[in-house]
């Protein structure tokens, strides 16, 4: 299971609820993209969330 390298976001689980409130298991997945970033001065390919990319927490190489 992929996990965000910067923020640590990963898949969370819960219940989907029908109109009659019957629970069914489901998953919420973060929007992760595989990008190359600089880690300790060297390029590395890691999973990063689009929110981290858009906010400028990491820069692509």
Curated annotation (Swiss-Prot):
Carries keyword Ribonucleoprotein?
Answer: yes
Q: Where is the composition biased (Polar residues)?
A: 9-23
Q: Does the keyword Ribosomal protein apply?
A: yes
A GO cellular-component term linked to this record: ribonucleoprotein complex
Give UniProt keywords alphabetically.
Ribonucleoprotein, Ribosomal protein
Signal peptide range in chain numbering: none
* Matching InterPro entries: Bacterial_rp_bL28 (IPR050096), Ribosomal_bL28 (IPR026569), Ribosomal_bL28/bL31-like_sf (IPR034704), Ribosomal_bL28_bact-type (IPR001383), Ribosomal_bL28_sf (IPR037147)
- State a single Gene Ontology molecular function: structural constituent of ribosome
Coiled coil where?
none
- State the disulfide connectivity: none
Residue numbers spanned by region Disordered:
1-24
Q: Which GO terms describe its biological process?
A: translation
- HAMAP family, alphabetically? Ribosomal_bL28
Family to which the UniProt record says this protein belongs: Belongs to the bacterial ribosomal protein bL28 family.
- Protein name (record): Large ribosomal subunit protein bL28
Q: In which organism is this protein found?
A: Lactobacillus acidophilus (strain ATCC 700396 / NCK56 / N2 / NCFM)
